[in-house]
């Protein structure tokens, strides 16, 4: 066994190169999925509004995402994350071609972690507002608005799904990049 030259090291042959390329392709796919999640969330939230007449057509209540600063933060944060992910796509393609690139992958991990923090903060803040919109808070005399603005609440709830999905994909991206770096 000692003369065979194998001492528990992984082979750097064609199989290892194929696995590295597969990880890079998976990285690209995850980035595209994260772009879709963050962009769809930002668009869904940013285009959400509902008008409800109050007694007559002349007196109306209008609810928009921009009425709540937390939801504005949600749109901006998801837009920033989406822009970053779009900008990172060419670098991810470079990793498919040159899977041995190390420093660019470190840079991507750093910014992926920053975007994960941003999307997590936005999704969490948005979830808190959506919870209040659905349930209200009796002790603070905040009434649930989703009984009146049901379309508005459905859209903002739906936009949270894309953002939380993007969070999961960003976590997978970070883990995938760490595995790819560990294989070097």
Swiss-Prot record:
Cysteines paired by S-S bonds: none
Membrane topology: Multi-pass membrane protein
Sorted UniProt keywords: Cell membrane, Cell wall biogenesis/degradation, Glycoprotein, Membrane, Transmembrane, Transmembrane helix
Transmembrane segments: 23-43, 73-93, 106-126, 160-180
Domain of life the protein comes from: Eukaryota
Stretches in topological domain Cytoplasmic: 1-22, 94-105, 181-184
Entry GO CC: plasma membrane
Compartment(s) of residence: Cell membrane
Keyword Transmembrane helix on entry: yes
GO-annotated biological processes: cell wall organization
Glycosylation positions in this chain: 49, 137
Short name of any one Pfam family annotated for the protein: CASP_dom
Topology, Extracellular side: 44-72, 127-159
UniProt entry tagged with the keyword RNA-binding: no
Self-association and partners: Homodimer and heterodimers.
Protein family membership: Belongs to the Casparian strip membrane proteins (CASP) family.
Function statement: Regulates membrane-cell wall junctions and localized cell wall deposition. Required for establishment of the Casparian strip membrane domain (CSD) and the subsequent formation of Casparian strips, a cell wall modification of the root endodermis that determines an apoplastic barrier between the intraorganismal apoplasm and the extraorganismal apoplasm and prevents lateral diffusion.
Protein name, entry field: Casparian strip membrane protein 3
Native source organism of the sequence: Brachypodium distachyon
């Amino acid at each position: 066994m000692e003369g065979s030259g194998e001492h528990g090291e992984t082979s750097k042959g064609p199989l290892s190169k194929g696995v590295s390329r597969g990880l890079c392709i998976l990285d690209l796919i995850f980035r595209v999925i994260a772009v879709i999640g963050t962009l769809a969330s930002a668009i869904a939230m940013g285009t959400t509004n509902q008008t409800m007449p109050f007694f007559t057509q002349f007196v109306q209540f209008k609810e928009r995402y921009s009425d709540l600063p937390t939801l504005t933060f949600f749109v901006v944060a998801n837009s920033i994350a989406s822009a970053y992910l779009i900008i990172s796509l060419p670098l991810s393609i470079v990793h498919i071609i040159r899977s041995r690139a190390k420093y660019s992958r470190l840079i991507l991990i750093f910014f992926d972690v920053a975007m994960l923090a941003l999307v997590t903060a936005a999704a969490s803040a948005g979830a808190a507002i959506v919870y209040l919109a659905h349930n209200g808070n009796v002790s603070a005399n905040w009434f649930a608005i989703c009984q009146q603005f049901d379309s508005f609440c459905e859209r903002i709830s739906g936009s949270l799904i894309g953002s939380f999905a993007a969070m999961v994909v960003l976590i997978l991206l970070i883990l995938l990049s760490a595995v790819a770096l560990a294989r070097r």
